[in-house]
């Protein structure tokens, strides 16, 4: 099995003078002494150390070789100053990580090394040298040390204006490589409130869980160690150097009698291994197999792109051609990908099964926002802005990164004319069963005309709420939504006083029907607004006042949206 890895963000490390280092060392020693005093010297009246860590040691549960959390970066990453990349010997340097999704680039190049027989050399007259790095290469690209690199769309929102790059191409979608693993008893994203997960900062690991939590209405707290607890109702995140190590940390905690982690956000195959070796304590809550919000894109140094547009056009054309060969002729081309990464061909096929390599029409729909079976560039970018919240102080316009002229030029020449958008659900079960637990639930207060099931067309919020529900169905092929209508129970006691339990039962039936009609009105509004939406992916029921969400009657007048995804 391969060791699938994605980028690890570089962390800023301050450099000090020798005197500063001495002072730092003295302060460090002093803090250790103070910590020892607080840990061992301060005891309650029963003589038990107040520190959770100390009590764990006394219970015979030392951390041993458990991975240590990292200090989280406050704010967003800081990149090196922008500079223009200059090709050397007519050869472009491109950096990637060990990921099958970049196989199209490797196929087009005929391997990693500069190749006179590559698609790039034969069709456009330049060569490409592909390097691999375990760390993010945003700074080397920005600073002109790379012509291009691969990153994910969500990261662009975090990097913002300082990232002087052009995005001319979507490489593909991750489909099943990213996964959230949790304690066996956790049934939905909503139930992650007050729990703690291990993750990796500023990559798709963090974005994936932030995206899910934001959609479920669960706020995020960033924790600095395992003994810290999130704010009430929040999901706590503890960061590690990479998502593999985050899963190692969760696996270690599962061996303790009182685990301090409730799960991890990581990458296959490590996530699968954690579940398999947990003795039934852990399970996969969700993967991105049918939740297409992790989209890899090609990032090109902006100064280089402006000076050498023909080379950028060649990169775009070559990667699309490599993607075509891997999609349509995998057997003939998989060997070069396996060799480049040191995989067996069986492992390469397994890794490619977790990737959707994008073609030309899928690219154009991705950037235009018209793709209806996966996340779009603008949609994922804005989801990242919303998910990171206050971390991103001054969000930028996603359009500043995009240049679709290269894709448009290829389409204008009639290239790849036979290709179609072909993103289908990957089914491991017959459908997204409404009998099980939803991935997440979201309460939405649609506005209706008084005492009726007619949506208030004058309320602008209703259109936004419809967009929210449609977004669920768009980014997740094969998923379904259950609309559960609710009304408030404010007058139940009044009905009881007027006519006893008989009147209460009668009015309860009317409330049930009104709530059903309201959920049907939402369903009908969705299918009216989004013509391509399959009505079979929507189900509507009424629950009347049977399931109040709050003592506040206003909050009980709602449509609960339950999202069921295929796994």
Where are the regions that the model predicts?
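N-terminal hydrophobic or amphipathic helices and topogenic motifs
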Residues: 2-136, 142, 359-438
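Second-shell loop/turn segments in exported
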Residues: 92-93, 127-128, 166, 194-200, ...
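Solvent-exposed, polar/charged alpha-helical surfaces in well-ordered, non-transmembrane soluble domains
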Residues: 103, 107, 139, 143, ...
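Pocket-lining segment of extracytoplasmic ligand-binding domains
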Residues: 153-155, 234-342
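Secondary-structure end/capping motifs
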Residues: 307-394
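Periplasmic peptidoglycan-binding/tethering modules of Gram-negative envelope proteins
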Residues: 398-482, 490-506, 532, 554, ...
């Amino acid at each position: 099995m391969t060791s699938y890895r994605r980028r690890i963000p570089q962390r800023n490390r301050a450099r000090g003078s020798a005197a500063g280092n001495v002072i730092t060392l003295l302060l460090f020693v002093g803090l250790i002494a103070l910590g020892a005093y607080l840990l061992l010297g301060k005891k309650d009246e029963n003589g038990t150390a107040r520190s959770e860590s100390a009590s764990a040691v006394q219970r015979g549960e030392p951390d041993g070789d458990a991975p240590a959390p990292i200090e989280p970066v406050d704010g967003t990453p800081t990149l090196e100053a922008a500079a223009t990349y200059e090709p050397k010997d007519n050869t472009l340097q491109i950096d990637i990580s060990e990921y099958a999704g970049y196989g199209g680039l490797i196929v087009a190049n005929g391997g990693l090394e500069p190749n006179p027989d590559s698609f790039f050399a034969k069709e456009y007259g330049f060569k490409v040298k592909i390097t691999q790095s375990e760390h993010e290469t945003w700074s080397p690209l920005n600073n002109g040390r790379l012509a291009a690199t691969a990153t994910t769309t969500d990261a662009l929102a975090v990097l913002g204006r300082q990232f002087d790059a052009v995005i001319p191409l979507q490489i593909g979608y991750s489909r099943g490589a990213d996964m959230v693993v949790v304690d066996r008893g956790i049934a939905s994203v909503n139930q992650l409130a007050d729990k703690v997960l291990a993750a990796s900062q500023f990559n798709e690991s963090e974005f994936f869980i932030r995206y899910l939590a934001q959609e479920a209405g669960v706020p995020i707290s960033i924790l600095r160690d395992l003994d810290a607890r999130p704010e009430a109702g929040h999901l706590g995140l503890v960061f590690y150097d990479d998502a593999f190590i985050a899963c190692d940390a969760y696996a270690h905690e599962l061996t303790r009698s009182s685990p301090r982690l409730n799960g991890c956000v990581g990458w296959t195959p490590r996530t699968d291994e954690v579940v398999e070796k947990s003795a039934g304590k852990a399970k996969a809550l969700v993967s991105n197999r049918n939740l297409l919000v992790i989209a890899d894109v090609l990032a090109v140094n902006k100064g280089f792109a402006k000076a050498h547009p023909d080379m950028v056009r060649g990169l775009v054309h070559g990667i699309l051609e490599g993607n075509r060969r891997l999609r349509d002729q995998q057997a003939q081309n998989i060997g070069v990908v396996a060799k480049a990464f040191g995989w067996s061909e069986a492992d390469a096929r397994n890794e490619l099964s977790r990737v959707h390599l994008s073609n030309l029409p899928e690219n154009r729909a991705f950037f235009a926002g018209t793709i209806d079976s996966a996340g779009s560039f603008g949609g994922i970018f804005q989801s990242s802005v919303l998910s990171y919240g206050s971390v991103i102080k001054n969000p930028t316009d996603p359009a500043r990164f995009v240049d679709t002229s290269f894709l448009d030029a290829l389409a204008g020449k009639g290239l790849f004319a036979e290709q179609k958008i072909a993103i289908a659900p990957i089914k491991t079960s017959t459908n997204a069963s409404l009998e099980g637990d939803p991935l997440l639930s979201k309460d939405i207060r649609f506005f209706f005309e008084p005492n009726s099931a007619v949506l208030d067309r004058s309320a602008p919020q209703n259109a936004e709420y419809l967009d929210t529900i449609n977004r669920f169905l768009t980014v997740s092929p094969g998923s379904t939504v259950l609309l559960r209508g609710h009304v408030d129970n404010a007058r139940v006691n009044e009905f009881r006083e007027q006519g006893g339990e008989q009147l209460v039962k009668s009015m309860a039936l009317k409330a049930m029907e009104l709530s059903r009609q309201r959920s049907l009105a939402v369903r009908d509004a969705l299918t009216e607004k989004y013509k391509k939406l399959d009505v079979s992916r929507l189900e509507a029921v009424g629950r009347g006042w049977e399931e109040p969400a709050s003592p506040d009657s206003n909050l009980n007048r709602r449509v609960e949206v339950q999202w069921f995804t295929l796994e």
